[in-house]
Every structure is written in C-alpha cells, then in structure tokens.
C-alpha cells in the first residue's frame, strides 16, 4: 500500500513530468528556429536581453532560449541536444542537480541554462574539477555562445590579474573550483579596489558536483604566508621516532588513523631528549613535533597519501588520485614528512585567509550541478545546499552487465585473479579498465601484468599529464588501462571498431571504495549511450573496508568451510555486509561534514563582516568619519577602564588616564590632570575628543586632504589585515581544543559560538585601538603606499585523526611574524622599519 502511495505522490516523478512537458514545448518550436538565417538566430540574443530589461524573467524566456541554443549547437558543433538533455537543462536552471549517466552529454546539456542565465549580464561560472576540462569545454562549448553573441572567458591559475579580470568580466566564465575560491580570498586581500578580479557571485553550474560539494567539502582553501621557525626539532623528532617499535612504544588505530605514544614510548622520549616530563608546558613544541613525526611515519604512506617528486613531497588527492602540486599539509605535518624522506625541510606557514567549498558555493545567488552519481548523497545536497537531485532518464536503455562481487580470502589471491581475468579478456581483444584506490595498488597490478607480457597504460597521480589521451584510447580493441580512483572523470571512453561485438568495455574494480558513489562512477565508465559493457569487482577479506568492519568473523567462518585462496565466493550476505559498511562510512562522513559546517559557519559570519567592512574601506573616498568613530570608541573604553562606576570619583586613577591619553592620542603635556579633575566620564570624553579633533585638523592642514585620506586607508587596512590574521589563528586554536568541553557536560559547539563571538568583539576593539594610536601618533611620509601585511601563497589542509576521507580542517599554525623592511615600524613612529628601529640591522 505504502509503495502505491509513494508512486502516486513521488515528487521526483512529478518534477520529471513537468520537465518533460517543457522539453516537449521546446521540441514543438524547433522548426521555427531551423528556418531562421544565422543572423536572425544571433539576433535572438539581443531580443531576449531587451525583453529582460522590460521586466520579463529568465523563466519566461526558457522555452525560446533553449530552442535557440539547441539550433545554434546543431549549426556550430553538429550536436543536437536530445529531449532528455533538455530536461537536464531545465533541472539545472531550477537550481537543482541533474544526475545524468556517463556519456549522456552533460557538457552539452549545461550550455542551455548557462546561455539563458548569462542573458542577465551578471555573469555565469561553469565549474570543473581540473584545468584540462575547463579549457576543453571553454573551447568546444564557447563556440556556441560566441556564435550567439555572448563573450566567453577562461580562468586559469597561471593568468595575471588583468587576464583574470577579463575572464570574469565575460558573460560566461569557465574555471576550476580551486581557482574560484582562491580568487575570492585574494580579492578580499587587495589594497586597491581596481585589483579585484571577481564580480558578485550570480549563478554557477558545477560539473562533477558530487566531487566538489561532497568529497572536497571539508577541504579548506588556505592562503598562507611564511612563518620563520627552526627546522631542527623536526630532524630530532624524526630520528627519535625511527627507534620506536609498533604496539610496544606506540599504538595505531587503523579506523581513525590515530597514532599515540604508549607509557613506554613516553619514557623513551623523556630519556632521548633528557627531560623529566614530556607533558610539561615548556615541552609543548617537542610533544607536537614527536606526534607529527609519528603520524608521518605510521599514518602517512608514500605513494598512497603523497609522492616524492623532484625533491618535494607532493600530496595525492585521495579522491581523484591526482597530485596536488603547490599544496602543503599544515600544522607541521608536511615538514615531518620531509624529515622522514630525508628532504630539505621548508618553513611552516601562517594562515592569512581561508574558506571551505561548502561556504564559498553557498554564496552564489543560484547554484546548480550535474554528475553521473548523486542519488546516494541526496539528503546532504538537500540539507546543506537546498538542491534537489533529479535523476534524468537515459536516452537509450543501459544494457551493461554488473556482475556480483567476487570475494577472495587474501589480497594475494585477489590480485592473481584480477591479472588472470585481464589476461583472458586481453586475449580476446576486449578493452579493460582496471580501477584501483591507491597508487601502490596500480603499480602492483602493473607488475603482475608485465610478468604476463600484457602491454598496458597506468594512469595515476604520477603521470596524470597524459590523462585525457590515455582515457580516450581506453576503449580501443586490446587496450588495457589501470586507473587510480576515477582519474579521467569528465573524459568519455568511446568504444573502438569491433569492440561492441566483444562485449564492450570491461571494468574491473580491485577494491570497494568507502563510498558507493565512487564505485558507481567506476561502473559508469562502461555501457555509455546504450553500449554493451561488463563490470566486476574483486574483493578480499584483507581490504581496508572489510578489515574496518568485522572481517575477522567472516574470515573465521570461511576457515570453517575450508576455503582456500584459489576459490572466490559470490555471497549476497558478504556483498550486503560490504554495502552496509559503505552506508555506515557515508553516514559518518555526512555527520562529520555537517558538524564541520556548523563550526565553520561561526567563522563564515565573521569573515563576511570583515570582508564587507574591508571592501567599504577600499571603496570609500573619505574615511575621516569612520576613523573618528574608531578613535571615540577606543577613547570611551580607555576612560571607562580608569573611571569604573563601582568606585568613588576620588578613587579614579586619573594620573594613569592622563598618561595614556598623552602617549596614545595627543602630544606630551597636551592634557593635564586638572583639565579633567571633577568631571564626569561623559564630560571627559567630550573634552578630550575636542582636543583630538583639533590635532586631527592640524595634521590634515599640514599634509593636505588627499595625503590624509590615503594615510587613513593605509592605517585601517593594515590594522584590519594583521588583526584578522591573528584572529583566524586564535579561532583555530580554540577549535582544536573545544571538543574537550564535552567532558564538562557543556555543548562544545555552543561554547565555540560564544567564545568565538567574544574573541571577534575583542578583535574589533584591537583594530579600533590600533587605528586610533597610529592615526594620531604616526608621521606621514611623502612616498606613502599601501603594503600587504604578508605575501600569501595557496596551501592545503591536514588530514585529521578520525577523518576517514583524509579531508579535514586546517590546523593552527603558531605565528612568528617577520617585519618587512618597508613595513611601518612596530614602535609606532610611522616611519618605515628600515628608516627607524631596523636601521642598525
């Protein structure tokens, strides 16, 4: 009965019926547009823009605009979107996720809503996972938009600011998710409004949306600067950790990836470093370095988590298997790995700006996405991004044969069987794609195939430059390709001549991923557009997923049956157990991402306030009123501190107040105790503010209005940037230890919100105090110019204990700020450091 009701009231079915009706309406007018000349078709863009200006909405234009793009696509590329692609386009325009199977033409589908929304002139961002796909799509699909009179931009990491600004100014901009996030952060660190590159965030269509909004949701984008620190401790901690023995000196939990010293290990450490107590406050740094060295040796594996290339430790993305060049683990883990591998240890970094993809993409007015696999994460898309997942039917039925899993007792038996299966298929000429979850697995299978004399291509983090070419050739007769973790997403595997007759592409999975979605992505490489295909997963009881969730019991059962390594089992019970393990991991990861978002929202609200005010500073012509208000707030606090309400006026420490006023706001001797004696705090405030304004006016007269306005901006920007950097670090420190509050029966999130707010208020007060002091006391130089507090560079996060996907929040970095020679001197003179206290260096 419930099943019948669900079918009757299924909202997805209703949505699809609505989309199908719109697709039929578009199809019904195709003849009108086929008869138009090229010029008449192009003129439709101008007509649509005029109608929008007169009050029409994009929804009003949808049917006609989609029909125009469809016809333009046929003329320019020779491709004519099917009805199911029109339905996918409507889903995207509605701000939803279109789940379309591999080979169903997602890229072409996106052109429909992208064109329609670009007509508003507010800009549309098409987001892809790598620069190869961004460049390819901008070139291929860009021709359609340019034919219709719209401009297309491509935003790449290597571009200058001027080139980026031009790319963002276009009607449609193709970019990677990383570049969009980093450009947003960099825009909020600029010193002049003209240096900004992005426009307000209007509409984004994300290709492979699950990869960006789910897999990478916990990845904070970080812009960091160098912090001067000694590398000696890393070397010493590394040498010590090499002497430790597993279980005896440290314990390692494979589920949570947590490593910690045992009592015996702690005693060893105290002996080795000649100290009494490793947990003494003065040994915090040593303790931290030993823990990071342990993590580097035990939890971080070479060729799985990172590779060593050209003397550098390069992080491997655990989802795509790609190298993340230029990114570094924070909290000293990267340096610990460098020490482990015997490489040159580079300086730690300090965070200047940070944002997660979750919070960046939620800033768009409208967000849409497409992928082949999103249904398993439907709840997360709905709860966090307010996006529905709409499964678009395939143009032709899927005839792929998905075989049940084959389960072996050991890894050795499993890999032998994989090599044997590949060899047999190779003999018949059937192309094979072997999917692995780690670089080392791909190299092991490659070795086994070499021994059998089977030519093959390996696609992993070490050689992803040839990725697209290898993937495109993977469907040719006799091709054998080994790929790590869905490398090659977004690139179609087209079947070569005679391959259909051999059964299509065979996909062989060597391990189940902890996410069903990634298994489905691998399956989806085969059987595109109604082609035949076959998929087979090989598992062993020693696989990480099986070990994590009770493989011991199953192993004992298999032993009782006398099962050896040459015979696999195809058991529905084991397959169900694997799937329930995956569901459990997915649930854990969803909870983890949701919790991170709640914590990150605290920093998001603060970041939005600071960035908004910072923009007002660089956009404003005159900051005089703002600066005066800052001075007044700072002065009010100073007076309140020396004239507490609970004390009698004769107990007030007026000498201290006079000293403070003269050293911070006025000149020596400008205020006497007699001036304020017997007055109420309000009267003191009025009197002192009058004198401050007089001094301010004199300063402005001396240096001229123009110079004074620029001076105010320099001071305010510098104060905001340096205090905000300190605040990010302080919030991180708070975040690290907040979970311990749960032991005191308090809600850690509530505590974090309250303390974070108090710290933010304190930061605002510090900014006001610093601005007041520098504006009133610093001297103005003739060659006045705004300067960055620290030069920034992009960096990565650090995997955290208990974080199954190795995607985690960035950890705090202790700052030791080097004063640049051209920076204002810390003594408050207003001169450059090199002309003041730094003159002797």
From Swiss-Prot:
GO biological process: one example: protein import
E.C. numbers: 7.4.2.8
Principal subcellular localization: membrane
Recorded family membership: Belongs to the SecA family.
GO cellular component: cell envelope Sec protein transport complex; cytoplasm; membrane raft; plasma membrane
Disordered as annotated region, ranges: 786-813
Statement: the UniProt record of this protein carries the keyword Nuclease: no
Protein name per its UniProtKB record: Protein translocase subunit SecA
Subcellular localization, as worded in the UniProt entry: Cell membrane; Cytoplasm; Membrane raft
Source domain of life: Bacteria
InterPro entries per the UniProt record, alphabetical: Helicase_ATP-bd (IPR014001), Helicase_C-like (IPR001650), P-loop_NTPase (IPR027417), SEC_C_motif (IPR004027), SecA (IPR000185), SecA_CS (IPR020937), SecA_DEAD (IPR011115), SecA_motor_DEAD (IPR014018)
Cross-referenced CDD domains: DEXDc_SecA (cd17928), SF2_C_secA (cd18803)
Gene Ontology molecular function, alphabetical: ATP binding; metal ion binding; protein-exporting ATPase activity
Residue numbers binding ATP: 79-80, 85, 103-107, 492
Binding sites annotated in the UniProt record for Zn(2+): 825, 827, 836-837
Catalytic activity of the protein: ATP + H2O + cellular proteinSide 1 = ADP + phosphate + cellular proteinSide 2
Pfam families according to UniProt: P-loop_SecA (PF21090), SEC-C (PF02810), SecA_DEAD (PF07517), SecA_PP_bind (PF01043), SecA_SW (PF07516)
Keyword terms: ATP-binding, Cell membrane, Cytoplasm, Membrane, Metal-binding, Nucleotide-binding, Protein transport, Translocase, Translocation, Transport, Zinc
Effect of residue 587 to C: Forms position 587-750 dimers upon oxidation in vitro. Does not form position 587-587 dimers (homodimers)
Record annotation: effect of changing residue 106 to N: Loss of activity. Cannot complement E.coli secA mutants
Organism: Bacillus subtilis (strain 168)
UniProt gene name: secA
């Amino acid at each position: 009965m419930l099943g019948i009701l669900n079918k009757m009231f299924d909202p997805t079915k209703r949505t699809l019926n609505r989309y199908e009706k719109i697709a039929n309406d578009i199809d019904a007018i195709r003849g009108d547009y086929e008869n138009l000349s090229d010029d008449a078709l192009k003129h439709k863009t101008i007509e649509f823009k005029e109608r929008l200006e007169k009050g029409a909405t994009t929804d009003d234009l949808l049917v006609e605009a989609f029909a125009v793009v469809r016809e333009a696509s046929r003329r320019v590329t020779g491709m004519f979107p099917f009805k199911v692609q029109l339905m996918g386009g409507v889903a995207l325009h509605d701000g939803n996720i279109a789940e379309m199977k591999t080979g169903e033409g997602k890229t072409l589908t996106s052109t429909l809503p992208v064109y329609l929304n670009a007509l508003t002139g507010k800009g549309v961002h098409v987001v892809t996972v790598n620069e190869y796909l961004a460049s390819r799509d901008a070139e291929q699909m860009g021709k359609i938009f340019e034919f219709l009179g719209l401009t297309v931009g491509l935003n790449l990491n290597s571009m200058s600011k001027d080139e980026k600004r031009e790319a963002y100014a276009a009607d449609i901009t193709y970019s990677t998710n990383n570049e969009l996030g980093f450009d947003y952060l960099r825009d909020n660190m600029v010193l002049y409004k003209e240096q900004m590159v992005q426009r307000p965030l209007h509409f984004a269509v994300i290709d492979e949306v699950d990869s960006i909004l789910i897999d990478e949701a916990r990845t904070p984008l970080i812009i960091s600067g160098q912090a001067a620190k000694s590398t000696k401790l890393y070397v010493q901690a590394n040498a010590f950790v090499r002497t430790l023995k597993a279980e005896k000196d440290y314990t390692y939990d494979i589920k949570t990836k947590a490593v910690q010293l045992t009592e015996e290990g702690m005693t060893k450490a105290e002996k080795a470093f000649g100290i009494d107590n490793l947990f003494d406050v003065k040994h915090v740094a040593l303790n931290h370095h030993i823990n990071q060295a342990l993590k580097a040796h035990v939890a971080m594996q070479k060729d799985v988590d990172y590779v060593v290339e050209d003397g550098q430790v390069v992080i491997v993305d655990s989802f795509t298997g790609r190298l993340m060049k230029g990114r570094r683990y924070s909290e000293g883990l990267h340096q610990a790995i460098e020490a482990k591998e015997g490489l040159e240890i580079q300086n730690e970094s300090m965070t200047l700006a940070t944002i997660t993809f979750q919070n960046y993409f939620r800033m768009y007015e409208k967000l849409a996405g497409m992928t082949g696999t999103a249904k398993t994460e439907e709840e997360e898309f709905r709860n966090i991004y307010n996006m529905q997942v709409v499964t678009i039917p395939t143009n032709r039925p899927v005839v792929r044969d998905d075989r049940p899993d084959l389960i072996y007792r050991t890894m050795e038996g499993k890999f032998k069987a994989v090599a044997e299966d590949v060899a047999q298929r190779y003999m018949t000429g059937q192309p094979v794609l072997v999917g692995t979850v780690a670089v080392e697995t791909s190299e092991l299978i490659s070795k086994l195939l070499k021994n059998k004399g089977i030519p093959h291509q390996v696609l992993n983090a070490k050689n992803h430059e040839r990725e697209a070419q290898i993937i495109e050739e993977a469907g040719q007769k006799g091709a054998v390709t080994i790929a790590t973790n869905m490398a090659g997403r977004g690139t179609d595997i087209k079947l070569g001549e005679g391959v259909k007759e051999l059964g299509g592409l065979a996909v062989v999975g060597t391990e189940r991923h902890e996410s069903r979605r990634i298994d489905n992505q691998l399956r989806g490489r085969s059987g595109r557009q109604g082609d035949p295909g076959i998929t087979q997963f090989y598992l062993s009881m020693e696989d990480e997923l099986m070990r994590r969730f009770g493989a011991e019991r199953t192993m004992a059962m298999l032993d009782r049956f006398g099962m050896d390594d040459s015979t696999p089992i195809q058991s529905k019970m084991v397959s169900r157990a694997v799937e329930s393990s995956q569901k459990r991991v997915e649930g854990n990861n969803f909870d983890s991402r949701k919790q991170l978002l709640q914590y990150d929202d605290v920093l998001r609200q603060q970041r939005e306030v600071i960035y908004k005010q910072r923009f007002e500073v660089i956009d404003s012509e005159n900051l005089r009123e703002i600066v005066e208000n800052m001075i007044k707030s700072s002065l009010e606090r100073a007076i309140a501190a020396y004239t507490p309400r609970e004390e009698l006026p004769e107990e007030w420490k007026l000498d201290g107040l006079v000293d403070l006023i003269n050293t911070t706001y006025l000149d020596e001797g400008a205020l006497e105790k007699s001036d304020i004696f017997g007055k109420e705090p309000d009267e003191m405030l009025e009197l002192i503010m009058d004198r401050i304004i007089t001094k301010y006016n004199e300063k402005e007269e001396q240096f001229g209005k123009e110079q004074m306005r620029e001076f105010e901006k320099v001071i305010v920007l510098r104060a905001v940037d340096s205090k905000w950097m300190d605040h990010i670090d302080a919030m991180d420190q708070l975040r690290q230890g907040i979970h311990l509050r749960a032991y005191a029966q308090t809600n850690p999130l509530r505590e974090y919100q309250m303390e974070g707010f108090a710290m933010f208020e304190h930061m605002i007060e510090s900014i006001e105090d610093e601005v007041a002091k520098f504006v009133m006391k610093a001297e103005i130089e003739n060659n006045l110019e705004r300067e960055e507090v620290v030069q920034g560079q992009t960096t990565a996060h650090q995997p955290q204990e208990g974080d199954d996907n190795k995607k985690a929040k960035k950890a705090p970095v202790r700052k030791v700020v080097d004063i640049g020679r051209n920076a204002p001197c810390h003594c408050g003179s207003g001169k450059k450091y090199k002309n003041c206290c730094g003159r002797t260096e």
